[in-house]
Amino acid sequence: MEIINGPVLPRYAAPATGALTSDAKISGQLLRRVHLRRRACGLQGDHYRAARRFFGFPSERHARSGWVWPVYCSYGSSSDGDGAAAADYDASGEEFVNSSVMEAVELRSVSDGFVIKMRDGKNLRCVQNNPRVLRLRDSAPHHAIVLKMEDGSDLLLPIIVMETPSIMLLAALRNIRIPRPTIYNVVKEMTERMGYAVRLVRITEMVHDAYYSRLYLAKIGNEEETISLDLKPSDAINIAFRCKVPIQVNRRIAYNNGLKVVQPTPSESYVSSDQFQYTRLDRPDDQPCFEAQEFDLVRNMLVAAVEERYKDAAQYRDQLFMFRAKKKNMI
């Protein structure tokens, strides 16, 4: 047997396709910070596992769940689609308008426009601001996060999302405490321990009926060192609300896809991204508030699941299914 002197160089086996690499690019520097500072930041147990699910390697996420959640990181030299540097969030501020989060539950299309159902049962009847833009042709209700423009136009921008991000945002709006940390709390704590702070969230563009958003981070003590992340709007808005930073919308998107309220209501229910105050609506007189009951069931189910009380969560789930079936028969 012969002995070969010299260093052993491991051979890297490239994946069969480059789809995962191109579909889920993530900054190497940010990954190194996450792994090298794991112990220094104290990200152990549930916090670390949640962080891995959020910033995990594409192959790992793909193998476990069958889908990839792309997280794109860019630094000062990148572009966010409008020609301005992605991390320089002050460069194109005139193209964006501040917005506030409303306590909306779902969006439904009707024959003469749209209906936004609020958390406490109020219905806002709306029409499209730009009639030439066609969208949401089906009449089925969709869970939605609704942003209100703060430029005096009072336009509403509904963003259709999954049920969980919508419920998590409503829980944050109502200051409902969840015992176990959510992924949004983990991201907030992780960025702070890494020396960064969330500064801004922007809804930048709409491509094939899907909104794109960016989350802007700045180095604490050095505002010129910035990072921008491409996230789903539902996640970016949840993080922005918990970090108490402005949520801005591209003016073109707000004009083309925004809705105008045509039915006046006694009062409005929204949370300002600057002042974070809200006006609580009165419940309908002598009428059951089905939305509030449904919200309580969903909240109890999620809290039980987070606390690993799976038997209780299953009971709340069955109650929720029965409640929704009963409400559907009443319509």
UniProtKB/Swiss-Prot annotation:
Single annotated GO MF:
nuclease activity
**Species for this entry:** Oryza minuta
PROSITE patterns assigned to the protein according to its UniProt record, in alphabetical order: BFN (PS51658)
Give the UniProt record's GO annotations in the biological process aspect.
protein ubiquitination
Record's family? Belongs to the bifunctional nuclease family.
Give the encoding gene's name: BBD
- Put simply, this protein is called Bifunctional nuclease
Main localization is nucleus
What upregulates it? Up-regulated by wounding, insect and fungal treatments, abscisic acid, etephon, salicylic acid and methyl jasmonate.
Enzyme's top EC category? hydrolase
Question: Taxonomic lineage of this organism?
Answer: Eukaryota, Viridiplantae, Streptophyta, Embryophyta, Tracheophyta
BFN domain location, by residue?
Answer: 126-261
Q: What keywords tag this UniProt record? A: Hydrolase, Nuclease, Nucleus
Which top-level group of life is the source organism from? Eukaryota
The UniProt entry's GO CC annotations, sorted and at most eight, read: nucleus; VCB complex
Q: Where in the cell is it found?
A: Nucleus
